[in-house]
Amino acid sequence: MTMDFADRVERVEPSATLAISNLASRLRADGVDVVDLSVGEPDFPTPANVVEAGKRAMDEGHTGYAPSNGIPALKEAIAEKLAADGLAYDADEVIVTPGAKQALYETFQALIDGGAGGGPGDEVVLLDPAWVSYEAMAKLAGGALSRVDLSAHGFQLEPALDELAEAVSDDTALLVVNSPSNPSGAVFGDAALAGVRDLAVDHDVTVVSDEIYEAITYGVEPTSLGTLDGMAERTVTVNGFSKAYSMTGWRLGYLAAPADLVAQAGKLHSHSVSSATHFVQHAGVEALRNTDEAVEEMRAAFESRRDMLVELFADHDVDVPVPDGAFYIMLPVDGDDQAWCESALEEAHVATVPGSAFGTPGFARLSYAASEARLREGVERLAAGDFL
């Protein structure tokens, strides 16, 4: 029997990082020491008090189904956190999801329609470089993509506002803003966000503000897009626990949005994942309320690593755009970036991610969610192999 697959799935390409991941796995299986700078997760343990809160919740019997949109205690804690950021959401305007990725997926599915008869669907505007799953989510929802390249502007949005204005129109259904950015680490300033606001209001566009890295910044304070005049009613704020609290495997995130969007996304949520894991949500309450010191320790470590990496590359006469947030650096590379990454892995045994995976060829993304010793080793190997 030959299965006939849905067009929406056929439109999605396999991850551009798959070849790198498979090659790294083969090398490790052969006993090769791979310096893995491709990983997008913190290398710190989850704070001990959060782990204990999760254990305690299991001991107390919180192992059954949770309310679909989230337990009241966590939704209230999220609303309090957002209020501290200047965002006025009621607890009922929050959906707790198994990871921020699910929150994004539900948002795309709730807002984007495919075109009639297989034609172009609703327009989604991405700012490149853009996290790899935005494109896939847009395609799975039937959307058509429009992309604005920020690489010529040092990955900053403000100098590219004219280009963004050309991309956004009355036909645009959704604009995705990720600040701090994965993969560039750029944090968009108030002038850039004001430009986004003006375009969104003028063209009646909904904006997704993906703020998953908002706790990991260096000398700048990110502004939440929904705090700007005219944006509360047209912004879906997405965040999660994976990056700030080193809880990637716990799978916990959320969206906050106007009540009508929450009602529609809630239908998708209840008919797909049902709910985020019950005891994990109790751990999330602890993370939001009692981890300031641990979060700052991780942030400071990332900043120290960033500074070290920038200096190491400068020692080899390589200038890299200095990120203001997240834990990635975009390294300019010559030629085909996919081939460069594969060769760097095969020959220098350093794993990185090609910039083309994010819509920006000519770069490799390096994660500094690794020890300083491994980061030094990685740069030394790249230099010795003439990759710098």
Describe these PLM feature segments.
Residues 8, 14-16, 59:
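N-terminal helix-turn-helix DNA-binding module of bacterial transcription factors
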